[in-house]
Amino acid sequence: PSATHVRTNHNIPDIFFEQDLVGVLKENGYKTALGGKNHAYLKPADLDFWSEYGHWGKNKKATPAEKETARFLNQQARGQWLEPSPISPEEQHPTKIVNEALAWIEKQKENPFFVWVSFPEPHNPYQVCEPYYSMFSPDKLPVLKTSRKDLAKKGEKYRILAQLEDASCPNLEQDMPRIRANYIG
């Protein structure tokens, strides 16, 4: 943070640098790509290939399945989904992101390349499809070694985060065992 002046996802306008990795690679003849979540200041024009995904789906939805996935994640599974997700393993973000990256890499036969693969998961909406949903039983997970009582020791940032969690997961304490199992799945 002291070098770039950026400490969070929310203060990208404050970024400070003379040259970045993508720029150096492009100057040296590399083809560049981003597949997945853009946790940077980069824009589509900065790279040769761009396929961005957010927490609620692909940013540019092209297929009916991508549109349905985004609808489900945005409207039904906003914070978490406590049942097996209707999104198939083939349509889950990590699978799509990896497949798109591999397809792009295949086209780079004669080119040096850099591909940034970044998954939105594990992150809310916490949803997972079969067979992963059933892999970890909530009642067999280790007991948590922390609770909301520890927030008093953690400071303001953690209290704000807890408020955000409560807003997206109104029954968080009750649902936490299933959410943890989904996260691991």
Model regions: which residues?
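Active-site-proximal cap/lid insertion segments
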Residues: N59-K96, W104-G185
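Catalytic-site neighborhoods of secreted/periplasmic enzymes
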Residues: P1-E90, I97
